């Protein structure tokens, strides 16, 4: 079973994502803010990270930079899943090591999961 860390401050959306991913065969752990995410990224056997950029304390860019600083997480795929859609946000995410950048309003959860499945085969 693949393990996903969902970093999302919107509790309703986090719940939807977690429920859908669990039904799709993922083991889910969640973080609601950057500080919580920084603690949870050290959990063993995380296969993929789903990261929102708009968080209440650290922003998603800071969390992504921290993830990529840790040797054991450098190769773990990080999908930025955010409502931010400006080119500068996409570029900055890629520069910091995001595997992909998906705009929430452009993808259903089913499409997101299909995309995740191709990444973590």
What do these predicted ranges mean?
Residues 8:
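Conserved acidic carboxylate
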Residues 11-29:
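Two-component/phosphorelay signaling modules centered on CheY-like receiver
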Residues 14, 56, 74, 86:
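The feature encodes the CheY-like receiver
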Residues 30-48:
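Acidic, metal-coordinating helix/loop segments flanking the phosphotransfer/catalytic sites
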Residues 33, 59-62:
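Acidic catalytic/metal-coordinating carboxylates
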Residues 52, 82:
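Active-site residues of response regulator receiver
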Residues 61-74:
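Short amphipathic alpha-helix used as the core "switch/output" element in two-component signaling
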